[in-house]
């Protein structure tokens, strides 16, 4: 989205709050907010990712000012006003949605994917990840400059929330595995949206999309986010009552506050409704890594 939209909403809210304040309180509010102005102005100007300390030096005059004085306020504000940010995202993921990086954005994948990279001399290098049978990682620059080929041999995309499950997935022809590490970063999202469009244009076969994550509130929210922002055809994999019952001995207690959140999202997720109902009934969830202890229930 256009970052200016959410910062504009933030300042509009600030104006509305200031209208009903006494002069003394208003001056205190404006004094508190004034120090954040250069930071939000910098966020407003970003058109591509920048490392956190470089952003801080450029717009705030010191490499550590953002992290020490601005970061917590920016994150809480973004969670309130930025539609690309989910309340459940950790700090690093929120900053990535705002184009501020603590480290490079990378996409880990396993399977056959064809794309091209343009060299500095203008020539094009074709790449097929099929040879990396145990998986490979595309760095930030590759995600930015890769051009996905129009012809792909992908029948199924399977996303894993956790790395151990991604690594353990066996290479199979026609399946592209992705590791989401929670929420995909903006560069990963943009790359995967391009891939989705290419696959939609294919007439040879209809691609299936699956996501496998933790059987808890966080896993459900991640599934919902990926389905909303990247792959609208996404289906849950190993995120059902059958899988839950198969691994019930590995359940962990869900805190009361999170249980209340689960109740609020039950109607938002028809594909996960039965699982959510079971989580609420038992008050317990299961982490995806437990599926690797012993194969039970539904597996790839």
Regions found by a protein language model. Name each.
Residues 1-179, 184-197, 202-203, 218, ...:
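Nucleic-acid enzyme cleavage-core boundary/entry regions
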Residues 158, 176-179, 208-210, 234-238:
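Short hydrophobic alpha-helical runs that function as membrane-insertion/retention elements
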Residues 197-204, 230-236:
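Arginine/glycine-rich "motif VI" loop of SF2 helicases in the C-terminal RecA-like domain
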Residues 206-216:
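Acidic beta-strand-to-loop metal/phosphate-binding motif
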């Amino acid at each position: 989205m256009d970052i200016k939209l959410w910062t504009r909403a933030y300042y509009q809210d600030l104006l509305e709050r200031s209208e009903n304040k006494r002069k003394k309180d208003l001056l205190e509010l404006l004094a508190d907010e004034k120090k954040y102005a250069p930071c939000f102005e910098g966020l407003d100007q970003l058109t591509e990712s920048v490392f956190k300390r470089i952003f801080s030096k450029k717009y705030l005059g010191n490499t550590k000012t953002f992290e020490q004085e601005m970061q917590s306020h920016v994150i809480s504000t973004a969670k309130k006003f930025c539609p690309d940010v989910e309340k459940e995202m950790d700090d690093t993921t929120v900053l990535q949605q705002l184009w501020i990086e603590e480290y490079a954005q990378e996409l880990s994948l396993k399977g056959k994917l064809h794309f091209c990279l343009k060299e500095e001399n203008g020539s094009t290098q074709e790449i097929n990840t099929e040879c990396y049978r145990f998986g490979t990682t595309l760095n930030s620059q590759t995600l930015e400059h890769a051009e996905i080929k129009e012809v792909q041999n992908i029948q199924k995309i399977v996303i894993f929330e956790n790395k151990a499950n991604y690594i353990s997935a066996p290479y199979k022809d026609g399946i592209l595995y992705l590791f989401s590490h929670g929420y995909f970063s903006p560069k990963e999202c943009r790359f995967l949206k391009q891939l989705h469009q290419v696959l939609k244009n294919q007439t040879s076969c209809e691609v299936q999309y699956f996501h496998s994550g933790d059987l808890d509130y966080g896993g459900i929210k991640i599934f919902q986010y990926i389905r909303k922002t990247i792959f609208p055809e996404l289906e849950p994999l190993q995120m059902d009552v059958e899988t839950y019952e198969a691994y019930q001995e590995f359940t962990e207690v869900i805190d009361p506050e999170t249980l209340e959140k689960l109740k609020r999202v039950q109607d938002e997720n028809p594909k996960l409704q039965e699982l959510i109902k079971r989580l609420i009934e038992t008050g317990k969830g299961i982490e995806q890594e437990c599926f690797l202890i012993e194969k039970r229930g539904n597996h790839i």
